[in-house]
Amino acid sequence: MNTVDPITLAVVRGALETAQREMTLTLEKTSRSSVFNLAHDYSNALFDHLPEMILQGQDIPIHLGSLIPAMKCVAGFFGDEIAEGDVIYHNDPAYMGSHILDCCMYKPVFYKGELVFWTVCKGHLTDIGGPVPAGYNPDAKEIYAEGLRIPPVKLWAQGQRREDVINLLLTNMRARAYQEGDLNAQYGACSVGERHLIELLDRYGVDQVRACITELKDMADRHMRALLRDVPDGFYSGTAILEDSGHGLGELSITAQVEIRGDEAHVLIESPPQVPYFINSYAGNSISGVYLGLMMFAQVPPPYNEGLYRCVSVDLGPSGTLCNAQEPAPHVNCTTTPMETLADAVRLALEQAAPERVTASWGHASGINIAGHDPRNNNDEYVTMVLASVISGAGANKAMDGWPACGPLCCFGALMSGDIELLEYSYPVLIHRYSLMTDSGGAGEFRGGSGTRLELEPLKHAMTVVGFGEGRQLPTAGAAGAKNVLLEPKLGRLIHRHVDGEEDHYIQNTLLTAQPGERVINVNPGGGGYGDPLRRPLATVLADVRNGLVSIDGARLEYGVVIDGNGQLDEAATHAHRAAH
């Protein structure tokens, strides 16, 4: 164990956290797209020279887990050809990226000629080229039909901006001004982080800072090992189901085999062969899914760095499978599907080991991208993911209900829906409704968080809509004996309502065009419940009904609570009903 002065350790740790927070604020305040500045679909991290992650932000989990293998891949790609002033860009899943819309910037930090740190920023660009706006192409049979792949490439070389390379990238993207603005914001964030780190090195020197970082990683390792020692040794298995894509694949299953031995864990993933559809997951993304499933169980205190995973080994199964995809498998939906299902499989396995530790599953992402030409602004092209459309409910745990409208499992509460008024200001749409959905939270002693309903209309133009995600066929999984009776309210939905009132309902990923006067309605599922619903206190169920979160029928059918037409609790009927069940 390192002997580091605890005061110095606390100051260095605080300085690292400040550097990361300043990176986040820079992105929020200087980026161009609503996906960045409203929804915060980005993540920042700091790495040391090894390169190992020394600090992750409280950002998007699916980004952060994949950064660990991606950083090593990028650094190894350039080897000794990394110089002061270089900036590297990358999105390719074949190089441990997540999906090609998540573009990552890596800035090496040199101090007195020595590489000491990396500042890293990953964010979801609203477009990456390809035949479908926003990149989600449900008809893609290969990765080449999804958009621009960017293997590790230097956008700045020894401090010089490479305009030819940057122009090549941006020329292949829709709504170029938005993508360029977000790319520049990423550069600003990495540079701000670099400045803070150099100030830290000026104060304490390389050796002292490295000693503190080693201790912080060791501390995270000790926390995780202590948790695993409290879990009974054994083999645990969990299987989660991917919904029918409508492409002749049927339902697909992912199984996680978790072995706990002392203070170590080994995770083996079993998945079917990769498919000619955009739900394949390459290794970097799948590793992140395993880590997310583990962290739904672990609940360890900070610091959060690569030390957490020293005692965890991951085997994704044979190459060419759904969770260990190889070129040219299409993949762009992978950060939601199958990643959320993969994380669920790990969570289900760990629930067998220690059910009191797990969180029920969160609602899966079930959202839309929109694109068109803005009639208010010289018909300029726009394209964006509507982040308010992917706000599902959080899972409950042994002590509390799931949070409503907290975002999908892949983001674990870090994704913001953004202000509806700012969405309308930024894009030519009218929001008719944005609300929580009654009976959408999974039933349990602790109820799952409610999902959301968004209704929008294009204004004075035809709007392309891309529906993606899951949760439209299978309800969110609960935990510890939770069970649902009302299934329909707990499912996501995508509805195209025409001017005459006729509606088209979609349960799979789809492309459609909406005209002025028509509505696109997107419903996100709620989170899973925890524990037996019949153990939920009567007063709590009554409060849920009065707040519109549970219907009178839902109270009776799922919780055994009888409420009359005046909204009053019938205790005698309730006790009889619960006794009969």
UniProtKB/Swiss-Prot annotation:
Belongs to the HyuB family. The lineage of its organism: Bacteria, Pseudomonadati, Pseudomonadota, Gammaproteobacteria, Pseudomonadales. Activity is dependent on the presence of ATP and bicarbonate. The requirement for bicarbonate may be related to allosteric activation through conformational effects, but it is also conceivable that carboxyphosphate is formed and acts as a mediator in caprolactam activation, forming carboxy- or phospholactim. This is Caprolactamase subunit beta. Transmembrane segments: none annotated. Its EC number is 3.5.2.-. One of its GO terms (biological process) is glutathione metabolic process. Binds 1 zinc ion per subunit. One of its GO terms (cellular component) is cytosol. Keywords: Hydrolase, Metal-binding, Zinc. Its cofactor is Zn(2+). It is an enzyme of class 3 (hydrolase). It comes from the Bacteria. InterPro entries: Hydantoinase_B (IPR003692), Oxoprolinase-like (IPR045079).
